[in-house]
Amino acid sequence: MSDDIAALPLQFTDAAASKVKNLIADEENPELKLRVYITGGGCSGFQYGFTFDDQINDGDMTIEKQGVALVVDPMSLQYLVGGAVDYTEGLEGSRFIVTNPNAKSTCGCGSSFSV
């Protein structure tokens, strides 16, 4: 994929890519990719999910950074356009987070939102 990050509908931060790279190295499976997806549920109607996947399905968007890939299915992508996948470590623990400008409201847990 091009290095023109302004054209990407979803940003994959350096911190997230670095953590994915470390986790994939721990799993000893270089075919793994971080998949971000949205499902119905949570206290605000939708929730974010993350999983490692070794498959890329038809229609998936792939963003590569630091030699690792973030994969998003087309249905989830429509809710994530303009957002970013990041990784943070703090007093609350460490986790992947989504910054989503399309979310009209979010829940205190940070993984649930409404549009």
Curated annotation (Swiss-Prot):
Cofactor note: Binds 1 iron-sulfur cluster per subunit.
A single GO molecular function term of this UniProt record: 4 iron, 4 sulfur cluster binding
Pfam families: Fe-S_biosyn (PF01521)
Necessary cofactors: iron-sulfur cluster
Domain of life where this protein originates: Bacteria
Binding site for iron-sulfur cluster: C43, C107, C109
One BP annotation, GO: iron-sulfur cluster assembly
Keyword Metal-binding: yes
Alphabetical keyword list: Iron, Iron-sulfur, Metal-binding
Gene Ontology cellular-component terms listed: cytosol
Iron-sulfur is among the record's keywords: yes
PANTHER family from the UniProt entry: IRON-SULFUR CLUSTER ASSEMBLY 2 HOMOLOG, MITOCHONDRIAL
Oligomeric and partner information: Homodimer.
Similarity annotation: Belongs to the HesB/IscA family.
Function comment: Required for insertion of 4Fe-4S clusters for at least IspG.
Name under which the protein is recorded: Iron-sulfur cluster insertion protein ErpA
